[in-house]
A protein has these predicted regions:
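Alpha-helical transmembrane segments
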Residues: 6-22, 42-44, 72-83, 144
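Membrane-interface helix-boundary motifs at transmembrane edges
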Residues: 2, 57-68, 126-139, 187-196
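Juxtamembrane "helix-exit" motif on the non-cytosolic side of transmembrane helices
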Residues: 21-29, 84-98, 152-163, 212-222
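Transmembrane alpha-helical segments of multi-pass membrane proteins
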Residues: 63-82, 135-150, 198-208
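C-terminal transmembrane-bundle signature of multipass membrane proteins
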Residues: 4, 8, 12-24, 46-51, ...
Length: 262
């Protein structure tokens, strides 16, 4: 049991600690090249760690624990809040306060999948029996992946010719690895996933989202309500990822018959 707990801690704690350190270093030095290089080195080291511990975990998701239910509920509620704020800012705010967007179609798709992803997380937390069918669950599990994809595209277009300025690299890459983690989760639901990809993408997503969003929330004066809300939401994604990694089931020992067949 102690060995199993050690591997569970290794799957989460290094990423959380590294993300916290990078975040607090970036608060006074948001554009530091040295910090960016350190972040790249940390992500590479976490990928190596994920490779080393991959055989200790199974290729399936754990049942709904209290921690997973809580994290899923938080993410679902924040996705709903992001949907509501975005729709209000685009269509119902006073004309002088409405947000002008470069590509309306991409924003609408991001909002649509934000709503659908919110329903998925809330159903997973509150009424998991509605997702008992594997096909239906897999279909719903793709909604947060598509939300992240259109959110990445929307933010990339909105930043114009300088998408990596002002910490944008952490932002875009953090969303990309969150999307990849969610895609790996969908593959685990489909019984086709691998623990290494799930662990590596999850740990890197935790680091990059913490490194970007904590400084954003700490120095919130120049950010809009929508940007701050999205920052909180991707920190909630980081919490969800950490909980999922910590509750990932251990690999089942092979029986002698299975070993002989292999």
């Amino acid at each position: 049991m102690k060995q199993h707990l050690t591997y569970r801690l290794l799957s989460v704690i290094p990423a959380v600690l590294c993300g916290a350190v990078l975040a607090f270093v970036r608060i006074p030095h948001p554009a530091s090249i040295a910090v960016a290089i350190a972040a790249a080195a940390v992500c590479a080291a976490l990928a190596v760690l994920a490779f080393c511990v991959r055989k200790q975990f199974g290729s399936e998701l754990a049942g709904g624990s209290t921690a997973v239910t809580f994290a899923s509920s938080i993410v679902g509620l924040l996705l709903l809040a992001c949907f509501a704020v975005s729709v209000y800012s685009l269509y119902f705010a006073p004309p002088a306060e409405r947000i002008a967007v470069t590509n309306t179609t991409v924003v609408l798709l991001a909002d649509l999948f934000s709503l659908l992803a919110a329903v998925y997380f809330l159903l997973s937390a509150l009424i998991p029996s509605l997702l008992a069918n594997q096909g239906a669950r897999l279909l719903w599990a793709m909604t947060p992946v598509l939300y992240c994809a259109f959110r990445i595209l929307s933010d990339f277009i909105a930043t114009g010719t300088m998408p990596l300025a002002n910490g944008g690299g952490y932002h875009i890459l953090g969303m990309i690895f969150a999307m990849l983690f969610l895609l790996c989760e969908a593959k685990l639901i489909a019984k086709k996933g691998k623990p290494f990809a799930y662990l590596a993408c999850g740990q890197i997503a935790i680091v990059l989202n913490a490194a970007y969003n904590v400084p954003l929330l700490a120095d919130f004066k120049g950010a809009t309500t929508a940007e701050l809300l999205h920052g909180v939401m991707f920190l909630a994604f980081a919490l969800y990822i950490a909980v999922r990694l910590f509750t990932l089931p251990y690999a089942q020992p092979q029986t002698e018959e299975a070993i002989e067949q292999a």
